[in-house]
Amino acid sequence: MGEVQLVLAVTAILISFKCLLIPAYVSTDFEVHRNWMAVTWQRPLCEWYTEATSEWTLDYPPFFAYFELGLASVAHFFGFDECLVISKTPRFSRRILIFQRFSVIFCDILYIAVCALYSFRSPRLVSRIPKKLQQNGREACFVLLASLQALIICDSIHFQYNSMLTAIFLMSLFFIDTERYLMAALSYSILLNFKHIYVYYALGYVFYYLVNYFQFSGNVLLANTPKAISLAIALLIPFCASIFPFIHASGVQGLQNIATRLFPVSRGLTHAYWAPNFWALYNFADLCLYRVLSLLKIGKFDAPTYTSGLVQEYSHSVLPNVSPMGTLCLVVISSMIVLTGLVIRRKDSADFSLFAVFSAFCFFYFGYHVHEKAIILVTVPMTVFAIKNPKYHSILIHLTCIASFSLFPLLFTPFETLLKYAICVSYFFIQLVFLKRVTLMPLSDLIPTRHVASWLLMGMVEVYNTFLHKWLWTSRLPFAPLMAISILTAIELTGLIGALIWSTFGDGIFEIWWAKATCQIRERLIRDSTYSVQAVEDLDDVKLVAGIDTSAAKLNSDMVYISVSFWTYPDLKHVATISDTRMLELPYIPQYLAVREAEVMADFLKSVITERPELRPDVILCDGFGEFHSRGCGMACHVGALSGIASIGVAKNLTLHHTYETIGMENKSKVDSFVEHCREVYKNNKTSPGFIPFDIVEPVVLNILRMGSSMNGVFVSAGYGIDLELSTEICSQLLLNNTTIEPIRAADLESRRLVRENFDGNEKLE
């Protein structure tokens, strides 16, 4: 299906579905926006931010007020004047419902169009995706953004205009990806003047522009002054257009009226239903302390009021009260730390969407009076970033599941209860299908067991809240199940933030240190023969051998194909070659290749054996070294120990600098003499097969095995569960060509073929 056909099909499906949702439940936000239309239509501009006939007063920035005035003009033009009556009590009719629902649907069409523009025209979206999967990445981005479950719940049922605002943010992302930084800044400034909650992204923009827009080499002042002036103009134009009419109408008082409505301080630390952030955990800790201390009769504390389910100011019973300024300080400090780390660690390579994710996360997690719907501000840039970097797919899936559970309490009527489950479950499977198309990775990589366990736990709490709580407790403890959902989702979101930070910064100094330390511990256990293994002590024990190898995509070396090729022994008949894709999570560390690949290889081998037990090999051959290693434990040792199968390391090359590291620089001259000796032996004895022991150091852990009449050799070292003599004898029977051991060669060729066909296209592999 072509791009245009996909966009039209998805648009038709989504708009048709949203039309079916017109009769669905609406929240108080429905009356909020109707009243705003009425206020902007019926009152002069100077009274927009003072009109208080209804409790649902205008509290969005002026651009949104102008948008409401535009909707009011359309309503008046088409005869929907009942929408434009200022009333103290809510007004609702079928005509009002139809008009306001369709106003959202038309905004959704704009949003879908912007999703298509960004997904199919952004030059940076698929730069780290293998060439043959790039179109899949673009299609996944479009479908996942256009059908975002949080937007359907919040806009098409609950009722808001988040899709229109998200479209403006995506336009800013698009301009950044195309390096039109002034247009991106202008778009963001427009967005802020529509809804000030998008200040969540502000620090992300600041840090990204400092790194990518401004110049800090050469004559800094001369180079940056015109850039700063241009940026300031781009940012100020929307603000001037937004507030100048109010200054003209009411002077400074007009600005004060806007500020009073936009930044109320009488709403309490958390919303009526706690958003899944740090303050939900803080409230819960305070409640637990109050209950325990009251039970033990230690001190006298006021009963907590934050479990009333009302929007109000409140005090904590035991823990210190938290002021708006205190939360702002936490937001700024946490943002500064993580964004500074992103600049230092990633320098100019970090994508803006990641800056936006971290900036929004800090505001959402520590912000004052955060609404659960604000999770949209995290999921949108996270969706974009996960497409750009497939390493984050599992984090994205977990985030959207947490978002779904946190949004469920918004819809509580019987029909909408089933509807919200259907929407979120459908989106979950859509996400799995399209993300799998981007990487071809197995589902186990996308949905780790720990995530599944947390979803089941949250699911049980949700079922209890919806179907059992009222039946068991009637009208008692109404807030308890909502609090349980808030706490569980807050805990999961905290863990997700930790995982995101680890995935982003963990490949730095700390993760390298940690990876080396754990590798060295494992190697100590390997040298002590702690791991159980089906050892090979005689050639009669060997009936089936297997070679294993990996090949990586050119544009993303973390995406690999693993192939394992099975052969009978000693007659060397091919039995099967099985391959699959994997994502390598850890970075490459010199002399620690096993850290990156060994566990992935061993897990894949065990999964193959589990599915096909008849293919369990007696020996596994790895492309690399075994005991011939600077620490005595190369790749083959790790794979053998982790899989429980005797292993042999077979390397095609013996690079001298690695050899020096392995046996010590003091033996450098001996190595050079030995290499020259081997060349002379092979040159003068072309028809003599056999091997030459690498006996510079004792005990001998490496044999150089000649490949037929070739002057080349392969380098054999024992891995785990087998000795060098037997390893060399087995390998000598596996040479069918003059390149390497046949099972390894077959695995290598197959993995390269699959990379070429499914990742890189027909370009020549390096």
UniProtKB/Swiss-Prot annotation:
Superkingdom classification of source:
Eukaryota
Q: What is its EC number?
A: 2.4.1.265
Which locations, inside or outside the cell, does it occupy? Endoplasmic reticulum membrane
Query: Can you tell me where the transmembrane regions are?
Result: 6-26, 60-80, 96-116, 156-176, 190-210, 228-248, 324-344, 350-370, 395-415, 423-443, 452-472, 482-502
Gene Ontology cellular component annotations, sorted alphabetically:
endoplasmic reticulum membrane
Claim: rRNA processing is one of the keywords in the record: no
Q: Which residues form a coiled coil?
A: none
Tell me how this protein sits in the membrane: Multi-pass membrane protein
Question: What is the documented function of this protein?
Answer: Dolichyl pyrophosphate Glc1Man9GlcNAc2 alpha-1,3-glucosyltransferase that operates in the biosynthetic pathway of dolichol-linked oligosaccharides, the glycan precursors employed in protein asparagine (N)-glycosylation. The assembly of dolichol-linked oligosaccharides begins on the cytosolic side of the endoplasmic reticulum membrane and finishes in its lumen. The sequential addition of sugars to dolichol pyrophosphate produces dolichol-linked oligosaccharides containing fourteen sugars, including two GlcNAcs, nine mannoses and three glucoses.
Q: Which PANTHER family match?
A: DOLICHYL GLYCOSYLTRANSFERASE, DOLICHYL PYROPHOSPHATE GLC1MAN9GLCNAC2 ALPHA-1,3-GLUCOSYLTRANSFERASE-RELATED
The similarity annotation says: Belongs to the ALG6/ALG8 glucosyltransferase family.
- Under what name is this protein listed? Dolichyl pyrophosphate Glc1Man9GlcNAc2 alpha-1,3-glucosyltransferase
Protein's organism = Caenorhabditis elegans
